[in-house]
Amino acid sequence: MKGSYKSRWVIVIVVVIAAIAAFWFWQGRNDSQSAAPGATKQAQQSPAGGRRGMRADPLAPVQAATAVEQAVPRYLTGLGTITAANTVTVRSRVDGQLMALHFQEGQQVKAGDLLAEIDPSQFKVALAQAQGQLAKDKATLANARRDLARYQQLAKTNLVSRQELDAQQALVSETEGTIKADEASVASAQLQLDWSRITAPVDGRVGLKQVDVGNQISSGDTTGIVVITQTHPIDLVFTLPESDIATVVQAQKAGKPLVVEAWDRTNSKKLSEGTLLSLDNQIDATTGTIKVKARFNNQDDALFPNQFVNARMLVDTEQNAVVIPTAALQMGNEGHFVWVLNSENKVSKHLVTPGIQDSQKVVIRAGISAGDRVVTDGIDRLTEGAKVEVVETQSATTPEEKATSREYAKKGARS
């Protein structure tokens, strides 16, 4: 009796389980049939035409540039300081009280312009004394010459002795010597008076005054009255490695003036352009460099004494050089290389030999030719033979490009 009871319960449980399984089977079938049209449509719209449920990987976006053939100037660069062509400390040559200053601080002056005046009173007095002594001695000389003429007539008749005649002749000569000394004294006094008016010895810009009106000054003062710096023209002194000396000398022998450019501290703005003036006659053994001097007209006052600048000297121009953006040049274990795009926008690595380069462009001596397209941005995840999408350089990225970049970044992060 108990066995039959248990058998009935087993049968009931089996029937319930079968019913539940049948329900889930039919429910899943209906769901798959309702989803089938959408899945088929999605498979048809798949750009790769691959298996259902597979998505095509987005192409890596890159920026590219075309290698061009052009003339490339070769520059030697160095750090330098602007120096005045001449620097003069204006000092007084005479002692006295400073009566007046005839310049404005920072003013441009010409050679001969009056800068200052010393009290001339004592020099006028000294000049008058010298002139008076000269006049007196000239009168004495005139009288001595008249006496000599009389002595010469009397000597012919033996009315005066030869000794007296010689004595008178000596007196005339002595007085003539005194006259010359008096004339020198007059010239000296006149010079002292002239020096009481202090003039500019060179063209240039005056600095700040070093002494005020009313002070007693002397020729021994080391500070002077004012300093004049000649800034038209003005010089640039910079250094080059000793290895560049041969290049500079060879360029000088070509007979053409070497152009030197002065750039600001950040090397972003050209201040002025001049020419090479000279090389120093020895190398600094401590630094292994040589000093170079260039001269600039500086009519626009773009350069100022003691100003720090970056110097660039043009020594040669390379004709028909293959040039690419510097951003395209990469360095790996094999050496320098670039990624080159073919007509299908597939990339391949090319080993290259770089030449002259700066922050913007680089000359490629071997490895690629003019007209080749090279990748300049988006290089990080490129692989040999990969197909890429070339995008234009834009100042502002579009929303579509941002989405593509994010999707590609996610894929790269997962790989």
Curated annotation (Swiss-Prot):
Residues 399-415 have a biased composition (Basic and acidic residues). Induction: The mdtABC operon is transcriptionally activated by BaeR. Residues 31-47 have a biased composition (Polar residues). It is found in: Cell inner membrane. Residues 31-56, 390-415 are annotated as: Disordered. It is a peripheral membrane protein. Residues 1-21 form the signal peptide. Part of a tripartite efflux system composed of MdtA, MdtB and MdtC. HAMAP family: MdtA (MF_01422). The MdtABC tripartite complex confers resistance against novobiocin and deoxycholate. This is Multidrug resistance protein MdtA. It comes from Escherichia coli O6:H1 (strain CFT073 / ATCC 700928 / UPEC). The lineage of its organism: Bacteria, Pseudomonadati, Pseudomonadota, Gammaproteobacteria, Enterobacterales.
